[in-house]
């Protein structure tokens, strides 16, 4: 058959309904559909899984034991499949040694460049350090103008105290007649009386030369003698000119600072040859932070001002503090901030050798009765962190420590030798600290000597290409020194995308998961250009995406639907964007054609007149900004990628509120002051972290509805007859659960060189409960049947019971009606976990003074899901709460009551407030990139509403 198509027959992974799909090869193909409709099941669990499996199966059994063997996806056949590479959103390494530079492998090229064309400069006196052969030294002298007078000196003593009598005797024995001592020429026959308490420099005059063409062999002999006597150093003292220093080592001829031979590993902070000896190549050091140890300085010592010694966890340290303060006369009923400096120092750093008598009896009768030195809370935390063998204790102590820049390497991670080598006047650490856009400018403008340019040309090409790829996927604001663990999922994915573009492969099937996440519309245009470039190399790109611009730029769209979960898994439309837009049954098509759209709000809420004000925010790239966050409104923070949105909201505002309201120990980013916190009662951070880390956590347990369901089953007649209580219906405790699988429903079978296999438990057949428990039914369904219901099915089933129905309805309201109540939390995506948290907030009693923070809640959402999400957020705001979100999606941005737009650019070019106000006001600000993209959307939607039929 023709090789221009990938043909899938009978795909049944997860909720796919035995579908047949034909995808054109060497095209940009978007798979879209509602959240949970089966997009990822088709793209990742079918296409990628089969492409990867076929490759792994071609390897030997020995190799497979290291790679693992993937299960064959549930599909009849796939024809025309290429080798598959998945570029997903899973964040990169959590290793603190991984940086953007190491992940992209640009660091390897930088290290090679500095090793091959770098020029060592002595950090002590600024003298160039070079390694030269005798032939190079002779060539250098012969390039001087003819008749130039000079003398060849051998520096045998450099800036050393002493009389040096043995040195002068040695010079006489060698047969030399002249010597230069502290800059003055003397005859060796003179008697030298040097002050032994002063530093002296002694240089032997090897030869006096007038430069002319026939003196090459004489110069050779002179330099060899000079180098032999001094251990590798020589000076050409040009009469009437500057002296020329020579060395056959990489060492400073003045102070002796040694670099050694330049090798790439010298410039690696992960190698002992290059790493800073103080921080071991991390660039940071952990220090106990007073602000974390005493987070609320208005508290007294008796009230628990010292967080690590809080009486909640143990009475030992509070009792020790009490007895120490009594005997050292430190008041415990005075706010910490009002204690004298001396008392604060004693509490923090100890009693400086003074002892106190300590008597303590624990709950088990153990007695400690000693005269002890009070060590202070900071010393105590530091000691326990470094001495403990317990991971738990180390994690607890780590909460009171902060990462400070290493003062030895100033955060560059490398030792003095590596940082002394310059290319273009800069060391490798300084260049790695530049934003990628500026770094690209540095290498484009780099001026090198003719010889160095020949060596550097291929290296520079690789560096420039890779930096350009990163810039083109919207990452110009990042630095190569940025730690990989601080990257968002979208940033990590785009870094891998740039790496793949740099590989220049063709004939590959790339599968991407929402690469537009975290990208402003301005940066998204560049990303689409990069995707097209990969396609034009002869690759097939399959992108799971909801972004309208990406869909319109695609060659082909596959729309999966019509609903989510059991209601999805079918192909609703497939074709070019124009063909899909004409499809009546495709929800995506209706949004593409404009027949369906998210309407503008009828009015913008004015809020309650109160606000939270942050002044002097200066963390990362924030430029000492003052920001007002109005309360009782739907507030959206916008700005191009890297403009400072996450820094402002997550690192400053969220941590300030968490510290003041929740007594959280996490240190906020730099700011001067905060006001207005008294106007809110509760901070709720709804992020995309998992709702549970074990398969036993599920939507029913997280939302709390499972407690109500277990109560209901315990009240049935059958349960009462058998004496079953609520605990009988838990799969976490003995009694009602299946003991063969301990309530997991599955068993793990280890398979040597094959991956572990998980099979349903043969006793309970995956139902998690024993047969006696499953005999108890409510309306013909047992507890396992209920856990297999989707939220939508469960709403109908529990219709007569308001307490259960209300909680389940919130799951449907946030677009999770397709999720099964017993679905393991580990299988939920980040977006699903975030909406699960939203749902659990909706059914709580609202005080009207909650402050909700969400970071990009539209991740993984179709336009129809976004419409539903906006409705949910509106419900929270209508109840009097404040919702603050970071978002790029223009449907959400246009629905806000108030916008805070940061920028104007990313990285160093950002960090200021470009515009604030309603979407209409921001759209009129010419300097705002958000406003430029928002204005046509507002105009389009007003026109749509004007022509839409009356409801």
Swiss-Prot record:
GO biological process, one term: SOS response
Domain of life: Bacteria
One MF annotation (Gene Ontology) recorded for this entry: excinuclease ABC activity
GO cellular component: cytoplasm; excinuclease repair complex
PROSITE patterns: ABC_TRANSPORTER_1, ABC_TRANSPORTER_2
Keyword Phosphoprotein: no
Subcellular location: Cytoplasm
Keywords: ATP-binding, Cytoplasm, DNA damage, DNA excision, DNA repair, DNA-binding, Excision nuclease, Metal-binding, Nucleotide-binding, Repeat, SOS response, Zinc, Zinc-finger
Zinc-finger in keyword set: yes
Main location: cytoplasm
Cited SUPFAM superfamilies: P-loop containing nucleoside triphosphate hydrolases
Transmembrane segments: none
Residues binding ATP 1, per UniProt: 33-40
Function summary: The UvrABC repair system catalyzes the recognition and processing of DNA lesions. UvrA is an ATPase and a DNA-binding protein. A damage recognition complex composed of 2 UvrA and 2 UvrB subunits scans DNA for abnormalities. When the presence of a lesion has been verified by UvrB, the UvrA molecules dissociate.
Family that this chain belongs to: Belongs to the ABC transporter superfamily. UvrA family.
Protein name: UvrABC system protein A
């Amino acid at each position: 058959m023709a090789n221009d198509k990938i043909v899938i027959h009978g795909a049944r992974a997860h909720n796919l309904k035995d579908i047949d799909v034909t995808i054109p090869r060497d095209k940009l193909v978007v798979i879209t559909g509602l959240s949970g409709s089966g997009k990822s099941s088709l793209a990742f669990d079918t296409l990628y899984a089969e492409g990867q499996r076929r490759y792994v199966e071609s390897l030997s059994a020995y190799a497979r034991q290291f790679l693992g063997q993937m299960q064959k996806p549930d599909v009849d056949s796939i024809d025309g499949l290429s080798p598959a590479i998945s570029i997903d959103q899973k964040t990169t390494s959590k290793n603190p040694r991984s940086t953007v530079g190491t992940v992209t492998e640009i660091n390897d090229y930088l290290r090679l460049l500095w090793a091959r064309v770098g020029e060592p400069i002595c950090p002590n006196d600024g003298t160039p350090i070079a390694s030269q052969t005798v032939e190079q030294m002779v060539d250098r002298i012969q390039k001087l103008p003819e008749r130039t007078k000079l003398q060849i000196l051998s520096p045998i003593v450099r800036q050393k105290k002493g009389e040096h009598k043995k040195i002068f005797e040695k010079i006489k024995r060698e047969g030399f007649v002249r010597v230069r001592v502290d800059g003055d020429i003397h005859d060796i026959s003179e008697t030298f009386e040097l002050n032994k308490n002063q530093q002296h420099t002694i240089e032997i005059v090897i030869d006096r030369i007038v430069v002319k063409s026939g003196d090459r062999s004489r110069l050779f002999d002179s330099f060899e003698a000079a180098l032999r006597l001094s251990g590798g150093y020589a000076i050409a003292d040009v009469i009437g000119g500057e002296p020329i220093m020579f060395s056959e080592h990489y060492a400073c001829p003045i102070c002796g600072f040694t670099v050694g031979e330049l090798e790439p590993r010298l410039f690696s902070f992960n190698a002992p040859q290059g790493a800073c000896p103080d921080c071991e190549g991390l660039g940071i050091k952990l220090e106990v932070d007073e602000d974390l140890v005493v987070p609320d300085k208005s508290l007294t010592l008796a009230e628990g001002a010292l967080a690590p010694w809080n009486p909640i966890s143990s009475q030992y340290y509070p009792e020790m503090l009490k007895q120490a303060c009594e005997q050292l006369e430190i008041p415990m009923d005075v706010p910490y901030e009002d204690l004298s400096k001396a008392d604060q120092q004693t509490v923090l750093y100890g009693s400086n050798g003074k002892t106190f008598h300590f008597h303590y009896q624990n709950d088990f009768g153990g007695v400690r009765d000693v005269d002890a030195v009070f060590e202070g809370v900071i010393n105590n935390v530091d000691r326990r962190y470094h001495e403990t063998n317990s991971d738990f204790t180390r994690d607890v102590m780590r909460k009171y420590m902060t990462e400070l820049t290493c003062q030895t390497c100033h955060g560059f991670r490398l030792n003095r030798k590596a940082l002394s080598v310059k290319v273009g006047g800069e060391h490798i650490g300084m260049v790695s600290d530049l934003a990628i856009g500026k770094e690209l400018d540095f290498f484009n403008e780099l001026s090198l000597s003719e010889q160095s340019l020949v060596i550097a040309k291929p290296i520079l090409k690789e560096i420039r290409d890779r930096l350009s790829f990163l810039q083109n996927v919207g990452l110009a604001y990042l630095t190569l020194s940025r730690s990989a663990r601080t990257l968002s999922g979208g940033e990590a994915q785009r870094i891998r995308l740039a790496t793949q573009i740099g590989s220049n492969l063709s004939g590959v099937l790339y599968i991407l998961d929402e690469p537009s996440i975290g990208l402003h519309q301005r940066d998204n245009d560049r990303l689409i250009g990069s995707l097209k470039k990969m396609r034009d190399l002869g690759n097939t790109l399959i992108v799971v995406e909801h972004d309208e611009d990406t869909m319109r730029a695609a060659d082909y769209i596959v729309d999966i639907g019509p609903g989510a979960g059991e209601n999805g898994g079918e192909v609703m439309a497939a074709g070019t964007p124009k063909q899909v837009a004409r499809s009546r049954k495709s929800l995506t098509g209706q949004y593409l054609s404009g027949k369906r759209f998210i309407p503008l709000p009828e009015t913008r809420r004015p809020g309650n007149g109160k606000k939270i004000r942050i002044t002097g925010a200066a963390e990362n790239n924030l430029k000492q900004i003052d920001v007002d966050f109005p309360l009782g409104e739907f507030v959206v923070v916008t700005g191009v990628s890297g403009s400072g949105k996450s820094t402002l909201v997550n690192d400053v505002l969220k941590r300030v509120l968490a510290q003041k309201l929740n007594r959280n120990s996490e240190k906020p980013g730099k700011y001067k002051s905060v006001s207005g916190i008294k106007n809110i009662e509760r901070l709720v951070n709804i992020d995309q972290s998992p709702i549970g880390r074990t398969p036993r956590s599920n939507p029913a347990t997280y939302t709390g509805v499972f407690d109500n369901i277990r109560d209901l089953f315990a009240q049935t007649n059958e349960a009462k007859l058998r004496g079953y209580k609520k605990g009988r219906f838990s799969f976490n405790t003995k009694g009602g659960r299946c003991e063969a699988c301990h309530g997991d429903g599955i068993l793990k079978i280890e398979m040597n060189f094959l991956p572990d296999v998980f099979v349903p438990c043969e006793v309970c057949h995956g139902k998690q409960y024993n047969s006696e428990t499953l005999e108890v039914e409510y309306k013909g369904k047992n507890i396992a049947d209920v856990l297999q219901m989707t939220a939508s099915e469960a709403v109908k089933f529990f219709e007569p019971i308001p307490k259960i129905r209300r909680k389940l309805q919130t799951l449907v309201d946030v677009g999770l009606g397709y999720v099964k109540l017993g679905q393991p939390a580990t299988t939920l995506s980040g977006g699903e976990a975030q909406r699960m948290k939203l749902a659990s907030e909706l059914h709580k009693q609202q005080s009207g003074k909650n402050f909700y923070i969400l970071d990009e809640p539209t991740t993984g959402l179709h336009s129809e899901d976004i419409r539903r999400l906006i409705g949910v957020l509106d419900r929270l705001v209508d109840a009097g709460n404040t919702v603050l979100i970071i978002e790029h999606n223009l449907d959400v941005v246009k629905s806000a009551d108030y916008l805070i737009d940061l920028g104007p650019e990313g990285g160093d070019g950002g960090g200021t407030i470009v515009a604030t106000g309603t979407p209409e006001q921001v759209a009129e600000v010419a300097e705002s990139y958000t406003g430029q993209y928002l204005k046509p959307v507002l105009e389009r939607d007003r026109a749509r509403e004007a022509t839409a039929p009356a409801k």
